[in-house]
């Protein structure tokens, strides 16, 4: 099967290759080709993303087949994962049979249905064909005799870089040599870690900086340097020239560029992300491709022109015949007795029912089993009757799956009501903490901040605090400078050895006590003063975005968030906005455990800002005029849910009313018990704990402080569903920490705008998280990041395996695997469940083309629960 570029522009017309391309044509081709890679955020602000976000106009199946053909990357679960899931009861056989029947109904074939079904049933066992059968002389002789049969499939190498088709005299593939050079130059240019010797001319851009140095690179041969000596100074011209001299026709250029981007998707993804951050680097992806293809030309030029550069071959029919012999019980003798038409029919059918198709049916059965189990769980709780108990406090948590067990235990142990909302609380802000000049976009990465909020305090207090911070910063700076200096680096071990040695021993043997001691020591030394926020609107010419909010904006953001979760009446005396954060030591992936809705940062800042806005008299008066009446004795507070230790840390508690104080005391009284239950449930899922845990909270703190711990928590592993509805829908349901939960009351959303906003914002973030975990599980060698213990943090950007690998884009092995042989994360596409009438879902799909496309192309699954409790799969 000839596989063209899946994003090839339909309007691209073939031209004579001697005609020069216009610059905008190359620009357009690079933009189109870039969709095969996803932007990669730096690991310090690790943002969940899924690697196929630019390919959603194609179906999941099309992309899976294309990746298998183009890169030999399999994005369906492996046979071992499927067998393990079936053994654990996660896949119902009946759903597999339904999926198979549906597939057979969609096919056209001229053989008895029973024959086709028998073949498929055996093939679905996912057993490998015996190597003895595939190498059998009789089978290969038969294949030669009937090789006239055309399955309609051709191999097309136009996607592959020319360097991948050539080996040098040492047997090294030239693409590996090219990748080695590109990795080296990317590390030099992108280094944000403050290397002592920065890349010269870096300010002129990647291509120009590379060009100034490349002719002095001793790792290149004299011939290779000569090719690049008089190379064009403009990146776009250089890229065009390289494509021309490599002999790439215009009709194949986009596919060729895609092949190069997919060769190092991590580094290319980081380049793409950087190109989106500033006007100065907006051409960075073109520069990257110019460097890469220029170097490829220099390396492969002695081998050009290639003979049979583009080779088309028929797919071998040996495995197709073998599959009918092994699974269809058709012997070689029977094959010889068939007519050519009968042989062709069998081979074409076996080709269509290939490994990807078989795994696709298994995945659909797995997902349908999960959906049915979730439906039954929700339905059983709906049938149960609940006594309406008095609520003394309401707590709003992030939709993060780690909040679900904590919320469940909290509601079970006390008179509380919980809500789910995106952890940035609808505030499109960039935050600046006290004593810092840097701001952090504290919102989902798909959005841009509109306001800057600064943490403020008394001027004298601020200066004193900054001085204390500077002491610690100076020590770190001095240590780093000595470490990077040629002379002082030899003295540093003598000076710091005793102290660091003591730290190593104590951190290793008593991590919880030492970690707590260091944390408290740092806190006592800094003595951070009480702070407020710059909430009032100020236009600062030094800031790209305004500081603070206008009165209308304050009211609008509070109203929007309260309506989004359906909290417009029945306010409890105490309403707590709970952001969340994680706590771990020596963990490059710390940001991956923070709040995804806050751009890989803790959510406490947003929670505190929102709670402060809710307590402002001017905001309450305006809301009251609109019908949202917050009682005078209702107080909003803010806290932070520490997901690694399942504790609630108060970060903003204003003066409380009498009833609010009672609610606060009630929360404080039961919180140790909630933490014990939540920690026990969570720790029992970790590989080390299969027996009873005496003190779960103590163990959780040890995990958080132990710098040798490679798995302080599971993060968002096993996430599988996103439930949008009232809390009554899932109250008392043990969702096993697998569901994102967002409150939604369709009765307060006549226009459907609230639902549309949930789908566009939190829904997209949840989908990205889900598919990142999915990709890191099914294809860890390509989309994951390998073993944590052998990773190298490089250039302040991300991790590599060793010092010359791709920049690894996904999650580490420890985030998704239970052991070397068994996965922990179940690779299922996200199931979005919406509690609303059918007409609401129909309107959503009709009005939101992007979401409809995701559902139709099976990037997400969709179900709904109507007001009568009826479940519908869409």
Swiss-Prot record:
Record's superkingdom?
Bacteria
The cofactors named for this UniProt entry are: Zn(2+)
Q: Which GO terms describe its cellular component?
A: plasma membrane
Please report the record's description of how this protein sits within the membrane. Answer: Peripheral membrane protein
Whether Zinc counts among this entry's keywords is yes
Sorted alphabetically, which keywords does the UniProt record give? Cell membrane, Membrane, Metal-binding, Transport, Zinc
- Keyword Cell division among UniProt keywords: no
Which residues are involved in binding Zn(2+)? Answer: 398, 400, 580, 595
Molecular functions per Gene Ontology: zinc ion binding
Q: Which residues cross the membrane?
A: none
Q: What is its main location?
A: membrane
Location(s) in or outside the cell: Cell membrane
Q: What task does this protein carry out?
A: Part of an energy-coupled inorganic carbon pump.
User: Could you say which protein family the record assigns here?
Assistant: Belongs to the inorganic carbon transporter (TC 9.A.2) DabA family.
Q: How does it assemble?
A: Forms a complex with DabB.
Q: What is this protein called?
A: Probable inorganic carbon transporter subunit DabA
Organism listed in the record: Bacillus thuringiensis subsp. konkukian (strain 97-27)
The opening ranks of the lineage are: Bacteria, Bacillati, Bacillota, Bacilli, Bacillales
């Amino acid at each position: 099967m000839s596989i063209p570029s899946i994003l090839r522009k339909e309007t691209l017309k073939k031209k004579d290759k001697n005609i020069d391309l216009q610059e905008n044509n190359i620009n357009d081709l690079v933009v189109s080709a870039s969709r095969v890679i996803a932007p990669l955020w730096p690991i310090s602000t690790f943002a969940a993303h899924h690697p196929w976000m630019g390919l959603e106009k194609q179906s999941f199946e099309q992309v899976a087949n294309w990746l298998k053909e183009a890169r030999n990357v399999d994005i369906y679960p492996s046979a071992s994962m499927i067998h393990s899931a079936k053994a654990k009861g996660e896949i119902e056989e009946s759903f597999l049979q339904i999926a198979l029947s549906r597939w057979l109904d969609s096919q056209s074939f001229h053989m008895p249905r029973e024959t086709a079904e028998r073949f498929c049933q055996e093939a679905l066992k996912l057993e490998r064909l015996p190597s003895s059968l595939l190498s059998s002389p009789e089978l290969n002789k038969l294949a030669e005799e009937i090789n006239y049969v055309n399955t309609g499939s051709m191999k097309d190498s136009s996607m592959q870089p020319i360097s991948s088709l050539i080996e040098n005299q040492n047997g090294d593939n030239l693409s590996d040599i090219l990748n080695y050079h590109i990795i080296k130059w990317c590390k030099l240019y992108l280094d944000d870690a403050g290397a002592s010797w920065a890349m010269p001319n870096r300010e002129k851009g990647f291509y120009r900086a590379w060009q100034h140095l490349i002719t002095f690179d001793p790792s290149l041969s004299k011939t290779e340097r000569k090719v690049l000596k008089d190379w064009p100074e403009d990146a776009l011209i250089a890229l065009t020239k390289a494509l021309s001299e490599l002999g790439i026709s215009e009709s194949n250029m986009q596919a060729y560029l895609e092949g190069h981007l997919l060769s190092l998707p991590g580094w290319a993804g980081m380049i793409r992300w950087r190109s989106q951050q500033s006007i100065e680097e907006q051409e960075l992806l073109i520069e990257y491709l110019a460097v890469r293809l220029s170097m490829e030309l220099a390396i492969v030029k002695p081998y050009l022109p290639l003979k049979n550069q583009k080779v088309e071959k028929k797919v071998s029919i040996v495995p197709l015949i073998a599959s009918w012999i092994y699974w269809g019980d058709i012997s070689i003798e029977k094959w010889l007795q068939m007519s050519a038409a009968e042989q062709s029919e069998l081979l074409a059918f076996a080709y269509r029912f290939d490994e990807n198709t078989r795994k696709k049916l298994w995945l659909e059965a797995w997902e349908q089993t999960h959906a049915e189990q979730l439906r039954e769980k929700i339905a059983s709780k709906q049938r149960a009757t609940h006594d309406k108990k008095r609520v003394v406090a309401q707590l709003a948590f992030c939709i993060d799956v780690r909040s679900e067990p904590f919320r469940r235990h909290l509601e079970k142990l006390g008179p509380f009501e919980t809500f789910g909302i995106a952890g940035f609380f609808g505030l499109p802000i960039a935050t600046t903490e006290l004593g810092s000049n840097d701001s952090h976009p504290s919102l989902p990465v798909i959005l841009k901040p509109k306001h800057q909020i600064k943490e403020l305090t008394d001027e004298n207090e601020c200066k004193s605090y900054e001085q204390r911070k500077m002491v610690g910063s100076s020590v770190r700076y001095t240590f780093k400078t000595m470490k990077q200096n040629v002379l002082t680096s030899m003295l540093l071990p003598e000076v710091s050895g005793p102290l660091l040695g003591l730290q190593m021993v104590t951190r290793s043997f008593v991590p919880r006590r030492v970690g707590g001691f260091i944390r408290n020591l740092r806190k006592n030394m800094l003595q951070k003063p009480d702070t407020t926020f710059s909430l009032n609107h100020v236009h600062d010419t030094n800031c790209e975005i305004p500081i603070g909010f206008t009165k209308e904006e304050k009211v609008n953001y509070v109203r929007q968030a309260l309506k989004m979760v359906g909290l417009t009446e029945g306010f409890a005396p105490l309403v707590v906005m709970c952001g969340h954060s994680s706590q771990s030591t020596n963990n490059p992936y710390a940001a991956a455990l923070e709040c995804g809705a806050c751009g890989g940062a803790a959510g406490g800042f947003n929670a505190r800002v929102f709670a402060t806005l809710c307590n402002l008299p001017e905001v309450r008066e305006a809301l009251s005029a609109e019908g949202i009446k917050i009682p005078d004795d209702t107080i909003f507070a803010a806290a932070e849910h520490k997901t690694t230790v399942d504790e609630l840390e108060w970060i903003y508690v204003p003066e409380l009313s009498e009833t609010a104080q009672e609610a606060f005391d009630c929360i404080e009284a039961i919180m140790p018990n909630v933490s014990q239950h939540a920690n026990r449930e969570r720790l029992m899922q970790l590989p080390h704990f299969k027996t009873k845990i005496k003190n779960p909270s103590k163990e959780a703190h040890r995990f958080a402080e132990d710098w040798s711990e490679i798995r302080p928590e599971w993060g968002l592993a096993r996430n599988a569903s996103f439930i949008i509805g009232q809390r009554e829908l899932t109250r008392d349901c043990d969702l096993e920490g697998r569901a994102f939960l967002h409150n939604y009351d369709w009765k307060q959303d006549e226009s459907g705008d609230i639902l549309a906003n949930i789908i566009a914002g939190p829904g997209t973030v949840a989908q990205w998280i889900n598919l990142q975990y999915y990709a890191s599980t099914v294809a860890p060698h390509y989309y994951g990041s390998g073993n944590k213990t052998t990773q190298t943090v490089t250039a302040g950007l991300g991790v590599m395996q060793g010092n010359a690998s791709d920049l690894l884009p996904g999650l580490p092995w420890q985030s998704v695997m239970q052991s070397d042989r068994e996965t922990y994360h179940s690779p299922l596409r996200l199931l979005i469940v919406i509690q609303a009438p059918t007409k609401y879902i129909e309107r959503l799909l009709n009005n939101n083309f992007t979401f409809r496309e995701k559902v139709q192309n099976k990037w997400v699954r969709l179900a709904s629960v109507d007001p009568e409790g009826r479940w519908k799969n869409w």
